[in-house]
Amino acid sequence: MTAVSQKTHTPPANFLLFRIAFAVFLTYMTVGLPLPVIPLFVRHELGYSNTMVGIAVGIQFFATVLTRGYAGRLADQYGAKRSALQGMLACGLAGAAWLLAALLPVSASVKFALLIVGRLILGFGESQLLTGTLTWGMGLVGPARSGKVMSWNGMAIYGALAAGAPLGLLIHSHFGFAALAVTTMALPLLAWAFNGTVRKVPAHAGERPSLWSVVGLIWKPGLGLALQGVGFAVIGTFISLYFASNGWAMAGFTLTAFGGAFVLMRMLFGWMPDRFGGVKVAIVSLLVETAGLLLLWLAPMAWIALVGAALTGAGCSLIFPALGVEVVKRVPSQVRGTALGGYAAFQDISYGVTGPLAGVLATSCGYSSVFLAGALSAVVGILVTILSFRRG
């Protein structure tokens, strides 16, 4: 009877999970489309420094960090669906600020300020979206399949980066920054329409500790996740300028290589954290990420840099679900949304801090040096993971 019941209910649950993941893909294009364009816009069109490029990219993630606690409480207390849909709306509003930056006849400083406002709104929306969809998906398929939920969401996120990066550069080069802004306004509305009828899941009853008390349970996997995040942050922030400084074409396809390898790994091996546990998977993944970043650092030509980006994407792919499985094991169900929000915040902090610091490093030592810094961070991540879980 149990087997029959599982066969009856698993396909609908998986289909609902697919709908949620596809909506994440559409909404996260608001991150993927402008990611390679913003450094070029800030550096070449507005005339600001590499440090300001890092701030423009990284400040989104600080906004995400600061609203993770709110997103987790919203998902836990009022329902994950509300959090996810609210995030989609905010991501669409970010495009409106960028449209103003593109069209208003104002100074470069005002345009930069409007760009920053849009990035802050996008960061707020991202925290609601990702915390909501993760908690929503686990409510649909159960915590025993938490690795699958995180894998599907990750495929959607990095699939959006893979598709969005070259598309964003194409839109910007042919139609300008205003067209890019309009596109980012429209995609979350499509996601809302596609996802709005998916059933909501009830909030869990029970005592709800604060985010900071939950952090005490999750900081070890969170630290490993943060050190992993440096690699993606330096690629996302400086790969366009790195390629331009070397006279290489296809900068947008570097993020496609990263995202494509990321998604492929999730598709082929996303089951591994649930099957083998997160620690072993995380250590191997960090080794692969290290190799990819070293290849980017030493790349003498564009195609080798593309291979390095793909290796980095393959390495980063399974780390979030691998260490996330350890998070789910450590917390009660009624604070799962808060815990996942806090866990993801470690990665957001990494992204936010890396941008400006890598900008200073790039100015002093050249763009290639930021990839060496990412590789060293991944090595430290391996050591931290081994030491943190050595008794497990």
Swiss-Prot record:
Stored PROSITE patterns: MFS (PS50850)
Localization per Swiss-Prot or TrEMBL: Cell inner membrane
GO MF annotations, alphabetized: transmembrane transporter activity
Stored Gene3D superfamilies: MFS general substrate transporter like domains
Main localization category: membrane
Metal-binding recorded as keyword: no
Any single Pfam family the record assigns to this protein: MFS_1
Classification via NCBIfam families: PRK05122.1, PRK12382.1
SUPFAM superfamilies for this protein: MFS general substrate transporter
Species of origin: Salmonella arizonae (strain ATCC BAA-731 / CDC346-86 / RSK2980)
Entry GO terms, CC: plasma membrane
Protein name: Uncharacterized MFS-type transporter YfcJ
Domain of life: Bacteria
InterPro entries the UniProt entry points to: MFS, MFS_dom, MFS_trans_sf, MFS_Transporters, MFS_YfcJ
